[in-house]
Amino acid sequence: MSDASFDRAEDAIRRLLGAEAVRAPRERESRCARIVAEPCDAEQIAAIVRVCEAERIALAPLGAARTLAEIRHTPVMLGVSLARMDRVVSHEPEDMTVIAEAGLTLGALNRRLAEHGQRLPLDPRGLGETALGALLGAAQAGPLRLSEGTPRDLLIGVRFVGREGRTVQGGGRVVKNVAGYDLMKVMTGSFGTLGVIVEAAFKLRPIPEGYTAAVAPFARASSAFAAAARLCDALPLLHAEVLSPVLAARFGYPGVFALIAAIAGNAPELEYQRGSLRALDGVALFDGPRAGAIYEQLRDLEFAPAAIAAQLATAPGELGRCVESIGAEFRAHAGCGVAQIFLGGEVDLAGARETVARWRSAARAAKGHLRILAAAPALRPELDFFDAPPPGVLNLMRRLKAAFDPSGVFNPGCFVGGI
């Protein structure tokens, strides 16, 4: 791609959208794109895609700028922000479904749904700033994944702009397109490499009447994981998070591992279920605003400062042993087989590579996998953020990319195997 191609593309996009809708990148966006376009509808996105294909200009959806800023080592030419596409298209309270544009943040959507006693129970860190498109593209989920699942579990429809500016829809009665792809599963976690998500439909849940949080200390990680497993068998928990000592200290439990679990329901249900929580040694129970504050702190828990942070996924029964064998600081979504692990302090490149290799070896031994979430700037370009899948799987993924994006304009080099 030449500078002339970029200049032609920028001029064409300014004419299509208006000069005020094309701007310089802000903060994290500068690590993702050289300029940013802010379309107001799917038709404008389609026009942008056609320009990019004609001029061979790469574009990146910027809803997940925080995630992309970690993965992408060099910015693409054009970032597409969906901040102006933030409308609720349809909300059916009786059916407990909602359709919304991809630029709407999860926080804004849930404030509107709360008027009807409903919510979309997905809870990534920083949900107030997390756009729905980013939620899907990066497959983000938090503590509530234990009870409510991940975006893939609540998504019932998706609309996106793909190759040649075509608008494609899947969901409802149209579960698969004519090529046989399950579009909802394909687009969730695709990191913007197959198209630009413009609209999504979700099933909703009622807001719980009451909420009780339990925090219990443990001398050993294995004891905390065993207690979490017993609780998961006994109760319909909202979440069951196990924290290593560095993170447990932020909740007032220094030098120990902590299990933070929660239940929800009406008053009689909560009182009945509290009996199982009280059986934990040293447990403290919290209700009302204090319980809510604990959950919010848990949801938005950050690892910073960390040289490397990664997400580990194994079978639920293997998670505790795998995390212990790694020996890093961690937060684990017990019962789900998912944990985030991190290495604090400073580390050189050789040490970083050795650490990541050791983490990945432990994940493979537990029949799991590991993805780097963040790394210090000096390390970021030198590390493989994704595990290498088996050759047959990678070949299938490349074929999927070629079918959806033959021109290679959608966020290239930002996924598994450089896809």
Q: Predicted segments — roles?
A:
Residues 1-32, 51-66, 285, 363-388:
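N-terminal accessory segments
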Residues 22-23, 29-31, 39-41, 61, ...:
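Structured catalytic cores of enzymes that bind and process phosphorylated ligands/cofactors
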Residues 35, 79, 251-264, 336-345:
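A generic structural motif
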Residues 40, 57-58, 69-77, 81-83, ...:
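Conserved glycine-rich FAD pyrophosphate-binding loop
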Residues 217, 227-286:
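A conserved active-site cap/scaffold subdomain adjacent to cofactor or substrate pockets
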